């Protein structure tokens, strides 16, 4: 089933504005709202980094229908996974079961500042993620949990306030190894757009399917979510210029994973020409043109499309998107 969501740009706006945008997303008919959990933003000038775990309950109180998820949170360094399990259990009760825990293996930018540690290689980050998910789920379903893993330990731990149905866990992946794990262990899978369709058709989606089948599920049992970077505006020049703030998205994964300050991230990003920045985005001023570039993701097997608009006028984006693009997307699904 096609679902359409909105990405609240926590690196670009303060928490109160973001709540209003989430409310507006529900009003215009979207199905979900998502937020990243950064300690530091990707830009120093004009950057923001409100705390997702405070923002999500505020959105839950102001909305009635939309799902509310993290895209994504790292439950392995800044946080003890047990605290994340407790927080999301509480938020699930407050929201009547509408929250989603979207997780990833993290970036140095958000973790080094609060730990001072050396940023580990992928092998350790992935191992920590797997262990944290196991621990979190055990706390949601068991009492008096005793857990001793390679990285975390619990002694007679119990979450007293938890929902009858555990919170869905969505796992972010940029390559086939983690995508296979997401298909096997996740209720959902998260990826981002703009990296060449072969990545999705030849690597990510086959890996999700393989992982799901290994767990005796079908790929349809996994909510296959993608953040689509869409700069849509009826004024094409505005649509192009709106991408500039998000130049850090055009840095390589290696660059982003090793950067430890917003100032350095901004410096690297500002060296990029606008044409290179815009390549990560679908830049469109015509709804048919936008849908034509979105449809390949649906054809690849992704079913939950979460739209991230880069401009500073999010009310304008939500209004134009919902009036021009959303009806055409619904017609496809």
UniProtKB/Swiss-Prot annotation:
GO terms for molecular function: coenzyme F420 binding; glucose-6-phosphate dehydrogenase (coenzyme F420) activity; oxidoreductase activity, acting on paired donors, with incorporation or reduction of molecular oxygen. The active site is at residues 38, 107. It holds the Pfam family Bac_luciferase. It is an enzyme of class 1 (oxidoreductase). The keyword Membrane does not apply. It catalyses: oxidized coenzyme F420-(gamma-L-Glu)(n) + D-glucose 6-phosphate + H(+) = 6-phospho-D-glucono-1,5-lactone + reduced coenzyme F420-(gamma-L-Glu)(n). Catalyzes the coenzyme F420-dependent oxidation of glucose 6-phosphate (G6P) to 6-phosphogluconolactone. Belongs to the F420-dependent glucose-6-phosphate dehydrogenase family. This is F420-dependent glucose-6-phosphate dehydrogenase. It comes from Amycolatopsis mediterranei (strain U-32). The lineage of its organism: Bacteria, Bacillati, Actinomycetota, Actinomycetes, Pseudonocardiales. The gene is fgd.
